[in-house]
Structures are given as structure tokens and as C-alpha cells.
Amino acid sequence: IGSCISLYEDELIFSSNMRNENLPDEFNRYDFDIYSVDLKKNKKIAVSISRLNSVNNDLSGSLYYDGSKLMYSKFNNDNFDIYESLRKDNNWTVGKRKMGDELRGPNTENDEFFTSYDPPEVKVYFITNGGYSGNKDIYFSGVKNKERNIWGGAQSAGIEINTNYDEGSVYIHPDGKTMYFSSKGHDSMGGYDIFVSEIDELGQWGKPVNLGYPINTIYDDNYFVMTADGRTAYFSSNRPSGNGGYDIYKMKYKGDKKLMLSQSEDKLFSEIKPIASLKKENVAKESLKLLTIFRGKVLDKVSLKPVEAEIKIIDNSSEN
């Protein structure tokens, strides 16, 4: 569950309660740990990210678009809170930094998990059971002081998004205006379904649209994430065609409007042994709108302080 992918689909991070080094509970169930898969390799092997895992449940949340940091949730003191780990020298740091403290930010005495970054990096979206409905809802918090790690109080994503039923996951696409989320409400076929909503000029999320079959079924379909080019996505489902519990499925975008599963319904088996190889299918050639994230600072040569600047980007491979 909790699939996270890098911008160009070279890494997959997820959580699983597969057999691990910790002891199972009285029902022979193992705690959730966080794993990483290098999608560039032919053999898809799930590797435990040991610095993030504990004897309690650890849930992956959101991999930043450039792969430089990861939000995840840890179970401590009877509730889940949000943590962040940074990637340094291709290794993850111990997630010591919480996204806010107490009621100043996302982390409260309630559960906060299954997070999502937004591209400007001024908000954190997450699932919480601390909303007004008493169910799991989608909330967000805005940063007030990034250096001091102070975040504003949690706010609901809006009445168009949250329902009287549970919302299960949220993902903000790199375009910054598209939200994919799961819900048992709206016009769900049954259990969790995956929906899409777009934000308007006033910053309000619009009426959600059900992605439809075969993505959604009468079973639970959840934890949807998509690549930057909008052509490939991963999600989890407990449909009968899987191996029991939640399995991770990969799908291809085929056509202008609808997201379609590949006919073979390639799934990533949540096991410690090599994950099943993904089949590369031929996709019809059509023009794609590619997204490039450009980040950096312009500094004064003497003072080394940030200065205002105008940057021009020229594509030598085209006439634009």
C-alpha cells in the first residue's frame, strides 16, 4: 500500500506487512514496513529502508517529485504522525523532523498518514481521522515558517472532496492542479474508489470524477499515484485477481480521457523475493506534454544572498 513513485518512474516506494524481522502479533500479522524498488533494473527486488522502519507500523506517504525527500508516518504514542526523511548520498536519513508540532501543524493527537507534497512545496495534504465528520478525511496544512518548521492549522480540502464516508488516500500531481484521491463516498462502485478533481482559479477543488472500471471495482481500490507525463500510474487493490490483501497494479494511459489497465493487469507482488517483471507494452504514438521541474537559487556574487532574477530557458532541439 501507499505507493510512491519518482517523477520519471525509476523508483517505487511502498509499505507492506509481509514477513519481516519483527515478531508477528497474536493473529500472526506482521507490522507494516517501508520498502524501495529500483524500477530501472530487470529484477524488481523490494529492499527494506531500515532507517525508516521500526517495531511499529511505518507507512510510506509521498516521495517528493525529484526524489530528494520522503514523507512517511510512524505509529507512536497510540497514533500516526508525519515524518520526513532526506536523501543524502543515495541513502535516507533517519526521519527526525516532524511536519509541525501539536496543533501548529499536521501532527496532532489524531492519526495523520498517507501524505502528499504539492509542487510549490507550501502545503502538505494528508488523511486524518481528526476532522469534523469523525471519519477519515483529506486535510492540508500550509507552511508558515519553513526554517523553523512551523505549519498552520489543518484545513479541510473542502465539501466537494470530503464526504460522510472515509477518504483513504490523496495524491497531488506534479502539475499542481490535479488531485487523485480515494473515497468510499461520492458515486463509489463499492468500497474505496479512485477519483480525480481539478482546482479552480480561486483555489477550490472541483466536483470529483470517478475514474471508472477497470480501475475501480466493487472492491477497495486505493493509493493512486501517477508519473509526470501522465502516461503511467500505480495503485493498490484487493480485487480477487491479486494474491490476497492489497496488491500493487501498474496501468497505462491509453487515449485522451480514460485511464486503462494493460490487458495483462501487471501487478507488483508485495513479497521480499524479486517482484514480477513488468511488461513493456507498445503505446500509440501521440504528442505528449512533458513536464520539467527547474529548481535553484540565484545568489549575489559577493553577499551570497538570494536576489530577484529573470531566467530564460531555450530549447535548442525545437523552434520554440
Please annotate each region the language model reported.
Residues 1-297, 302-307:
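Short, conserved micro-motifs composed of acidic
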Residues 310-320:
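Short amphipathic beta-strand segments in non-cytosolic proteins
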